[in-house]
Curated annotation (Swiss-Prot):
Subunit structure: Part of the 50S ribosomal subunit. Contacts protein L32.
Protein name per its UniProtKB record: Large ribosomal subunit protein bL17
GO biological process, one term: translation
HAMAP family per the UniProt record, alphabetical: Ribosomal_bL17
Sequence similarity: Belongs to the bacterial ribosomal protein bL17 family.
Species of origin: Cupriavidus pinatubonensis (strain JMP 134 / LMG 1197)
Gene Ontology CC annotations of this record: cytosolic large ribosomal subunit
Keywords, in A-Z order: Ribonucleoprotein, Ribosomal protein
GO terms for MF: structural constituent of ribosome
InterPro entries: Ribosomal_bL17 (IPR000456), Ribosomal_bL17_CS (IPR047859), Ribosomal_bL17_sf (IPR036373)
Pfam entry (one): Ribosomal_L17
Length: 131
């Protein structure tokens, strides 16, 4: 019986793992779609989903807790002004993990991690330029 299951080790030291998940969280909040390996994606979900739940209630204490995890003022602002209100009615499940084949060099399983209900980007300007 393993009490209090933690995060996977991912063959990294604890400081490297913390920094990697912090950088991946910031990238996901910035771009709302990232490509990574499947085990990293599953661990990233455990970090990102509680942060979005925290952002639903905009208080100084919650902003400080989010800043302690992200260490990026711009991402904390985006989290509380855009993402928190966007997912206010959703009770969880803010991320989607899609399997994306295997990496060329080492055959590692890859995945796309995206935030659900993200705005779709239209390619209309490219069509006008082609004409």
């Amino acid at each position: 019986m393993r009490h209090r299951h933690g995060l996977r080790k991912l063959n990294r030291t604890s400081s490297h793992r913390l920094a990697m998940l912090r950088n991946m969280s910031n990238s996901l909040f910035q771009h709302e779609l990232i490509k990574t390996t499947l085990p990293k994606a599953k661990e990233l979900r455990k970090v990102v989903e509680p942060l979005i739940t925290l952002a639903k209630k905009d208080t100084v204490a919650n902003r400080r807790l989010a800043f302690a995890r992200l260490r990026d003022r711009d991402m904390v602002t985006k989290l509380f002004t855009e993402l928190g209100p966007r997912y206010n009615a959703r009770p969880g499940g803010y991320t989607r993990i899609l399997k994306f084949g295997f990496r060329q060099g080492d055959n590692a399983p890859m995945a796309l991690v995206e935030l659900v209900d993200r705005p779709e980007i239209t390619e209309a300007p490219a069509e006008e330029a082609a004409e």
